[in-house]
């Protein structure tokens, strides 16, 4: 059985909170050395390498103690000692015990790694696939060349489209191989199979024209080209010796400075308030500029734009464009990154691209079945689609994995209000406030609105005072104005109308419908309702479920 050897194998570092764990066996906290014995160090490295996934007790015992005669009690003592070294308390839990399963490191971790040395380069020519549709063939050829070009840092040099696009006959192929002498080439033929297609692929070593591999790949209708690229990339990895790509390698940040900026941005994103999201946007944009080849900042930026849209503090159309751009960039860096695939799944389903969205979610879940990120995105997707019971179940799974995720808690509160009613929503809101979201302004504004709807005006006014004025914008402002209407009836209408007049693109924001209904009446609200419905407004699907709009259904 292999034994864990804590001898340094690289210059990478693990960074979490104010700790830095080096591969030379040292642990620093706020730049001061913390003593960590070899066994505790080995367990910590394995948990950090697992990147939030569960590590079984048997795995830890096998890798750290090897063939030594030990039992689970030794591991339990080691975990206890490690928690003391990390100064764990009730508010700062680093290691989570999952009874019957193992342990998981449950805090954000960033791996800092200097750029890896360039491996030996292998040149690849991708020939245009034989297809009935010439235009489709050219488009697919371009997509595959572009996708596989992303693997250049790992030893794969792909000839450009301009050189290979006209290479279709045997004569053309032989001339290209003779003139440019690539190491390998890929050819393919697409054969219709009902509504789907079969792609027959050959990988050939040019020296001696030796056929290395043949494979038939079924392409389902509407399946994104990136999935075909990923399958081809995996085939190349199996067939070409010396290729060394690792999906985790290109997600690592390359300096302590960019890591610290990322962690600050991620922290602000997780706070999930209007002010914190604006701060996250600045920090994560800065991080992308510092580490343009790292995946994590692009994913966080995409989620940030989506969150700002949900909160009504960023133009919805522009935010969706930005979110998609950053999610696509992440998949260009790694076609198999589950978080990026989950984000694209959410974005596609918001835009009613249900088949593509479903495929992306399925792929993300296969790659990372126990991921709080994927559970959150999928639960959000189900909520938008009106599948409230399934959405609630999925969000609960997310919160089980990450109880401190503010955005998931807020989403659960909306779902509860829509699905089981205001009394359950008030109880859940109180529960969330007593746990991790006691000062969150969006939660407070929702509780103020719920209490006002129930006629508990004094308690609602008391809660309103706890909301910072700098946070009263977007959806928080809408919630508080609706609460003011519940408390003051007609006297609140001038303020609501003034707010609606100041809002830009009111005709593109279904989230304002509850205020429009009370301020301008049922006829105008119904006109807006029908407009959103006829236009298939992407956010209307979420707001049409609101119990306050039952008159318009």
Curated annotation (Swiss-Prot):
Cross-referenced InterPro entries, in alphabetical order? OmpR/PhoB-type_DNA-bd, Sig_transdc_resp-reg_C-effctor, TPR-like_helical_dom_sf, TPR_rpt, WH-like_DNA-bd_sf
Is Transferase given among the entry's keywords?
Answer: no
The TPR repeat boundaries are 372-405
Q: Which residues bind DNA?
A: 11-107
- SUPFAM superfamilies found in the cross-reference section: C-terminal effector domain of the bipartite response regulators (SSF46894), TPR-like (SSF48452)
Gene Ontology molecular-function annotations: DNA binding
Q: Which CDD domains match?
A: trans_reg_C
Q: Tell me the function of this protein.
A: The main transcriptional regulator of the Salmonella pathogenicity island 1 (SPI1) gene expression. Activates the expression of invasion genes by a direct action at their promoters and also indirectly by increasing the level of invF. Also binds upstream of prgH and directly activates the expression of prgHIJK operon.
Please report the name of this protein according to its UniProt entry: Transcriptional regulator HilA
């Amino acid at each position: 059985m292999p034994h864990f050897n804590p001898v340094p194998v690289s210059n990478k570092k693990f960074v979490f909170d104010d700790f830095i764990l080096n591969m030379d066996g040292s642990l620093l906290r706020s730049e001061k050395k913390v003593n960590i014995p070899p066994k505790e160090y080995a367990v910590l490295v394995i948990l950090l390498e697992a990147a939030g996934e569960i590590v079984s007790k048997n795995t830890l015992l096998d890798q750290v103690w090897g063939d030594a005669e030990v039992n689970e009690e030794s591991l339990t003592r080691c975990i206890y000692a490690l928690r003391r070294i990390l100064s764990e308390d009730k508010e700062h839990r680093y290691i989570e015990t999952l009874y019957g399963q193992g342990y998981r490191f449950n805090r954000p971790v960033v791996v800092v790694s200097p750029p890896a040395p360039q491996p030996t380069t292998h040149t690849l020519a991708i020939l245009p696939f034989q297809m009935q549709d010439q235009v489709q063939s050219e488009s697919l050829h371009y997509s595959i060349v572009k996708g596989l070009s992303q693997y250049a840092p790992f030893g794969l040099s792909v000839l450009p489209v301009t050189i290979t696009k006209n290479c279709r006959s045997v004569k053309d192929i032989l001339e290209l191989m003779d003139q440019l002498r690539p190491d390998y080439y890929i050819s393919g033929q697409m054969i219709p199979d009902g509504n789907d297609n079969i792609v027959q692929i050959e990988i050939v070593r040019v020296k001696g024209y030796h056929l290395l591999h043949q494979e038939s790949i079924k392409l389902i209708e509407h399946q994104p080209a990136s999935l075909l690229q990923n399958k081809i990339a995996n085939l190349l990895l199996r067939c070409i010796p010396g290729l060394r790509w690792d999906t985790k390698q290109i997600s690592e940040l390359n300096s302590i400075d960019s890591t610290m900026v990322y962690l600050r941005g991620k922290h602000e994103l997780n706070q999930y308030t209007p002010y914190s999201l604006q701060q996250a946007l600045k920090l994560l944009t800065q991080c992308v500029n510092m580490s343009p080849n790292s995946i994590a900042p692009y994913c966080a930026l995409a989620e940030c734009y989506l969150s700002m849209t949900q909160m009504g503090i960023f133009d919805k159309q522009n935010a969706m464009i930005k979110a998609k751009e950053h999610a696509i960039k992440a998949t260009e860096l790694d076609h198999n990154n589950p978080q990026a695939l989950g984000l694209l799944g959410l974005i596609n389903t918001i835009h009613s691209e249900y088949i593509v969205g479903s495929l992306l979610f399925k792929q993300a879940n296969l790659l990372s079945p126990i991921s709080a990120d994927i559970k959150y995105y999928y639960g959000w997707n189900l909520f938008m689609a009106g599948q409230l019971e399934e959405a609630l179940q999925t969000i609960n799974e997310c919160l089980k994995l990450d109880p401190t995720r503010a955005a998931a808690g807020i989403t659960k509160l909306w779902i509860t209000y829509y699905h089981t009613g205001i009394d359950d929503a008030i109880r859940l809101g109180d529960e969330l406030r007593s746990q991790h979201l006691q000062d969150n302004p969006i939660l407070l504004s929702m509780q103020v609105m719920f209490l006002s709807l129930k006629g508990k005006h004094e308690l609602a006014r008391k809660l309103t005072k706890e909301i910072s004025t700098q946070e009263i914008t977007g959806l928080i402002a809408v919630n508080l104005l609706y609460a003011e209407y519940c408390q003051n009836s007609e006297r609140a209408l001038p303020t609501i109308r003034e707010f609606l007049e100041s809002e830009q693109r009111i005709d593109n924001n279904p989230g304002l419908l509850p205020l429009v209904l009370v301020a301008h009446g049922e006829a105008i609200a119904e006109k807006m309702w029908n407009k959103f419905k006829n236009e298939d407004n992407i956010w209307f699907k979420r707001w049409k479920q609101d119990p306050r709009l039952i008159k318009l259904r």
